[in-house]
Amino acid sequence: MNVIEGGVAAPNAKIAIVISRFNSFINESLLSGAIDTLKRFGQVSEENITVVRCPGAVELPLVAQRVAKTAKYDAIVSLGSVIRGGTPHFDYVCSECNKGLAQVSLEYSIPVAFGVLTVDTIDQAIERAGTKAGNKGAEAALSALEMINVLSQIES
């Protein structure tokens, strides 16, 4: 029986991080966690990491699509945070962001790691951006690294 599992070391990988500016007080912590993880665990050099900023979570799929279309990157890490308000806007933003990023991954056959927080409160966002509940940016970076290695093994 063959088992394919990816490790996280990917020292030659080129990674794009697409990040929303909206709720930047949360997102910058996610970005720090992602970059630290790529460098420490993935052994990815800083010159192989590109950060692309966009206005909000709804714009992340289009930015990710343009990045994927260049074929310069081995994976994309998407980062942002959507905090529930008093209107259905939250549901639309979360749904479209999630579907759009998944579509990019499948359309361009590139890992697009989902590090977009979808939370009810600011406290929940803070917890997931490096305090009690870990750092979801770091977790997304780990996922991207593992997927690079899994896909590489499948193709070899």
Swiss-Prot record:
Family annotation (Gene3D superfamilies): Lumazine/riboflavin synthase
Principal EC category: transferase
Residue stretches in coiled coil: none
GO biological process, one term: riboflavin biosynthetic process
Pfam families: DMRL_synthase
GO cellular component terms, A-Z: cytosol; riboflavin synthase complex
Keywords: Riboflavin biosynthesis, Transferase
Pathway: Cofactor biosynthesis; riboflavin biosynthesis; riboflavin from 2-hydroxy-3-oxobutyl phosphate and 5-amino-6-(D-ribitylamino)uracil: step 1/2
Entry's EC annotation: 2.5.1.78
Reaction catalysis annotation: (2S)-2-hydroxy-3-oxobutyl phosphate + 5-amino-6-(D-ribitylamino)uracil = 6,7-dimethyl-8-(1-D-ribityl)lumazine + phosphate + 2 H2O + H(+)
Domain of life: Bacteria
Catalytic residues (positions): H89 (proton donor)
Alphabetized GO MF terms: 6,7-dimethyl-8-ribityllumazine synthase activity
Subunit and partners: Forms an icosahedral capsid composed of 60 subunits, arranged as a dodecamer of pentamers.
Task of the protein: Catalyzes the formation of 6,7-dimethyl-8-ribityllumazine by condensation of 5-amino-6-(D-ribitylamino)uracil with 3,4-dihydroxy-2-butanone 4-phosphate. This is the penultimate step in the biosynthesis of riboflavin.
Protein family (similarity comment): Belongs to the DMRL synthase family.
NCBIfam families named in the record: lumazine-synth, PRK00061.1-4
Listed name of the protein: 6,7-dimethyl-8-ribityllumazine synthase
